[in-house]
């Protein structure tokens, strides 16, 4: 009987420790240095009064954060979009899930020789990324601004072959995404990934057009908070996600990144 009571006490103690770890304490999160770790540092300020300490582990690659999350070295990670996570799960056999979207980095149309979209004329040259995912995004932005019309249901897999209408006969040149900023002097406009635009010294505020928060691309490629399947109801992770999508975090993104990083959840 004594042994049974001791065993029960030990079991209750372990359950108590597990619950207390989730109800307060340290949350370990993996992240890319910019902007993810910076946004997490802001979220940490909101978590502290709730009894949570955020430990941020920075990674410079896109594989180890998921490996570490799967092996329980991390409680969550924040660096990727859901299509990447889904592909990682398929390739590695992991069971990681999204707790929700946090932010997106909008594509923009930037001026080259043409200083506004109205300056585009017959045969104007438009540079777009040459990789499949980003080219589709660029073409969807062109469609949203009325420059072209795509075939029905082309979606994010769209290529130049899916252009159904091109009233101005725009010439579309496919260029490596990292080289698009350099191409600006030689083209009329270029459609550039948010990260490359910033690295190239461009300001999103100066873009001729940018993706809207409710666009297919922005919702699909929003950066997410990833966790292990089964952890969705953990109070600490719910608190972390709430902090990341708070009005305070949204204001921080808008102020610090000047449009290059925007909250996925409108505040």
What are these regions (language model features)?
Residues 56-67, 154-182:
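Short helix-initiation/N-cap motifs at beta->coil->alpha
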Residues 99-148:
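A conserved helix-loop-strand patch within extracytoplasmic ligand-binding domains
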Residues 106-117, 221-234:
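A bilobed periplasmic-binding-protein/Venus flytrap-type ligand-binding module shared by bacterial periplasmic
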Residues 87-99, 114, 186, 191, ...:
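Ligand-binding "clamshell"
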Residues 20-28, 47-49, 117-123:
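Immediate post-signal peptide segment of exported/extracytoplasmic ligand-binding proteins
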Residues 136-143, 244-264:
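Periplasmic-binding protein-like
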Residues 58-62, 72, 77-86, 102-103, ...:
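Beta->alpha turn/N-cap motifs
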Residues 24-34, 52-58, 125-126:
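Short, well-ordered beta-strand elements
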């Amino acid at each position: 009987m004594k042994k049974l009571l001791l065993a029960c006490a030990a079991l209750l103690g372990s359950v108590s420790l597990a619950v207390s770890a989730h109800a307060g304490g340290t949350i370990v999160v993996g992240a890319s240095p910019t902007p993810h770790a910076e946004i997490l540092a802001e979220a940490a300020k909101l978590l502290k009064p709730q009894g949570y300490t955020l430990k941020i582990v920075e990674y410079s690659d896109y594989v180890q954060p998921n490996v570490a999350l799967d092996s329980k070295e991390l409680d969550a990670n924040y660096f990727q979009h859901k299509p990447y996570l889904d592909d990682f799960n398929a390739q590695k056999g992991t069971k990681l899930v999204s707790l929700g979207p946090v932010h997106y980095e909008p594509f923009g149309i930037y001026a080259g020789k043409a200083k506004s979209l109205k300056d585009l004329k017959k045969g104007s040259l438009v540079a777009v990324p040459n990789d499949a995912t980003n080219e589709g995004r660029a073409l969807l932005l062109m469609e949203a601004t009325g420059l072209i019309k795509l075939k029905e249901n082309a979606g994010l897999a769209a290529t130049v072959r899916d252009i159904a209408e091109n009233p101005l006969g725009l010439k579309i040149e496919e260029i490596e995404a990292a080289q698009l900023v350099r191409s600006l002097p030689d083209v009329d406009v270029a459609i550039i990934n948010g990260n490359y635009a910033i690295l190239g010294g461009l300001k999103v505020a100066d873009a001729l057009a940018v993706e809207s928060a409710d666009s297919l691309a922005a919702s699909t490629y929003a950066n997410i908070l990833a966790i292990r399947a089964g952890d969705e109801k953990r109070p600490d992770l719910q608190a972390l996600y709430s902090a990341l999508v708070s009005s305070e975090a949204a204001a921080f993104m808008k102020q610090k990144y000047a449009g290059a990083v925007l909250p996925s959840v409108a505040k």
